[in-house]
């Protein structure tokens, strides 16, 4: 269906809140499947029968870690060999059920799982409902239907559990696009992607918190160092702030990705150390600005992998080819954490110090107002000139040489 448009995440959340079933699909390079999803609090016989009739797949009950611990739901196997490490627990039936398989009895089991008074001894093992334990951090950690189900229930203000069921076509194969789209239209059912849900959470969830603020005298001048910690990963970042940000408008700013080799060792394989020095100098001269120092070593692949990439470059690859050879994208960085740090600092609009167009787009996608790009001007050397040319040619970096 060429004219099909996915639903808004807000509409999907509202449908979940109202007890309706929605359709969610994952990435093409993952399972590439659509699942029915609803909240466990609305695991009615009607909803379960609909999933069994039209979905035909296994009806599961994604739950949070807290619920799994409370009810003593243990992993189904000691060593998980599932292709996507889906966290099945031992299957269960509620003790008030008979065989446990009918839509009515599966409804009882699912709803009792989210009963505030439920306890481990209320369930027989094995059974006909299949709890799945969602990863802490949800779809931002694992892009699966398990995590999408629990995230959607949480965002709807409901208990952190739900139902999901894969959708098969009439011939027994898994239903894919455009048949999933056609089904959603025919049944007036909200249809979203896990990628949409990830993007929604990056914009709306509070994913970083400020820990401390201290004076930081540097060789460039005196700054205030604001420390931040990511809520999900525990990764630590720093914002170096100069001057008064009260109005938050047109702040001279830079997002600088950590580069131990360039920033601390003075490596000439890259221009990172020079860019950091240039940005600090410009902000000091302006008397007002922010540098976010993010823990994104090696364009997000980490220090050891960056050094492995250097090893491949010494054998003839360029910086992009080396990253790809190691199984990474040319640039693994995300900018939603940086955008949230700017927001917590009261920054409303920025003049961004960067030569990287992807950084501009990444911040704009998070709703940050970039009123101007300020180039970072550094002189190439004999050791990094080829690296800089590759970034210019293959990654679109805006250099003037």
Swiss-Prot record:
Keywords: GTP-binding, Hydrolase, Lyase, Magnesium, Manganese, Metal-binding, Multifunctional enzyme, Nucleotide-binding, Riboflavin biosynthesis, Zinc. The record marks 128, 166 as: Essential for DHBP synthase activity. Residues 1-203 are annotated as: DHBP synthase. D-ribulose 5-phosphate binds at residues 30-31, 35, 142-146, 166. GTP binds at residues 254-258, 275, 297-299, 319, 354, 359. Residues 204-401 are annotated as: GTP cyclohydrolase II. One of its GO terms (molecular function) is manganese ion binding. Pathway: Cofactor biosynthesis; riboflavin biosynthesis; 2-hydroxy-3-oxobutyl phosphate from D-ribulose 5-phosphate: step 1/1; Cofactor biosynthesis; riboflavin biosynthesis; 5-amino-6-(D-ribitylamino)uracil from GTP: step 1/4. It catalyses: D-ribulose 5-phosphate = (2S)-2-hydroxy-3-oxobutyl phosphate + formate + H(+); GTP + 4 H2O = 2,5-diamino-6-hydroxy-4-(5-phosphoribosylamino)-pyrimidine + formate + 2 phosphate + 3 H(+). GO terms for biological process: riboflavin biosynthetic process. Mg(2+) 2 binds at residues 31, 145. Zn(2+) binds at residues 259, 270, 272. Its cofactor is Mg(2+); Mn(2+); Zn(2+). One of its GO terms (cellular component) is cytosol. Binds 2 divalent metal cations per subunit. Magnesium or manganese. Binds 1 zinc ion per subunit. CDD domains: GTP_cyclohydro2 (cd00641). Its EC number is 4.1.99.12, 3.5.4.25. The active site is at residues 331, 333. Mg(2+) 1 binds at residue 31. Coiled coil: none annotated. Catalyzes the conversion of D-ribulose 5-phosphate to formate and 3,4-dihydroxy-2-butanone 4-phosphate. In the N-terminal section; belongs to the DHBP synthase family. In the C-terminal section; belongs to the GTP cyclohydrolase II family. HAMAP family: RibA, RibB, RibBA. This is Riboflavin biosynthesis protein RibBA. It comes from Actinobacillus pleuropneumoniae serotype 5b (strain L20).
């Amino acid at each position: 269906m060429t004219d099909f448009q996915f639903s808004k995440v807000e509409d999907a959340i509202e449908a979940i809140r109202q007890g309706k079933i929605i359709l969610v699909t994952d990435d093409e390079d993952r399972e590439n499947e659509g699942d029915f999803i609803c909240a466990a609090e609305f695991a009615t016989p009607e909803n379960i029968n609909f999933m069994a009739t039209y979905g035909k797949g296994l009806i599961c009950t994604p739950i949070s870690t807290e619920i799994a611990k409370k009810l003593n739901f243990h992993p189904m196997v000691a060593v998980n060999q599932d292709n996507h490490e889906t966290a099945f627990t031992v299957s269960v039936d509620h003790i008030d059920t008979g065989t446990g398989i009918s839509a009515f009895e599966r409804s009882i089991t699912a709803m009792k799982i989210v009963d505030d008074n439920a306890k481990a001894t209320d369930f027989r093992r094995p059974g006909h409902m299949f709890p799945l334990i969602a990863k802490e951090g949800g779809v931002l950690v694992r892009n699966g239907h398990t995590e999408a189900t629990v995230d959607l229930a949480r965002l709807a203000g409901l208990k952190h559990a739900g139902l999901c069921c894969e959708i098969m076509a009439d011939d027994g194969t898994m239903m894919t696009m455009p048949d999933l789209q056609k089904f959603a239209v025919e049944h007036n059912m909200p249809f979203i992607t896990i990628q949409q849900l990830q993007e929604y959470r990056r914009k709306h969830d509070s994913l970083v918190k400020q820990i401390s603020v201290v004076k930081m005298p540097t060789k460039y001048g005196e700054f205030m160092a604001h420390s931040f910690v990511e809520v999900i990963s525990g990764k630590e970042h720093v914002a170096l702030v100069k001057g008064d940000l009260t109005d938050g408008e047109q702040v001279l700013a830079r997002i600088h990705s950590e580069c131990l080799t360039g920033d601390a060792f003075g490596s000439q394989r890259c221009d990172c150390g020079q860019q950091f020095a240039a940005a600090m100098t410009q902000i000091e001269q302006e008397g007002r600005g922010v540098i976010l120092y993010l823990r994104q070593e090696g364009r997000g692949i980490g220090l050891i992998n960056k050094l492995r990439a250097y090893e491949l470059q010494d054998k003839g690859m360029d910086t992009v080819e080396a990253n790809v050879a190691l199984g990474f994208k040319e640039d693994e960085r995300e900018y939603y954490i940086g955008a949230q740090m700017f927001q917590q600092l009261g920054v409303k609009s920025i003049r961004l110090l960067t030569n990287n167009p992807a950084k501009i787009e990444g911040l704009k996608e998070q709703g940050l107002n970039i009123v101007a790009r300020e180039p970072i001007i550094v002189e190439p050397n004999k050791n990094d000139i080829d690296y800089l040319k590759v970034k210019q040619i293959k990654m679109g970096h805006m250099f003037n040489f």
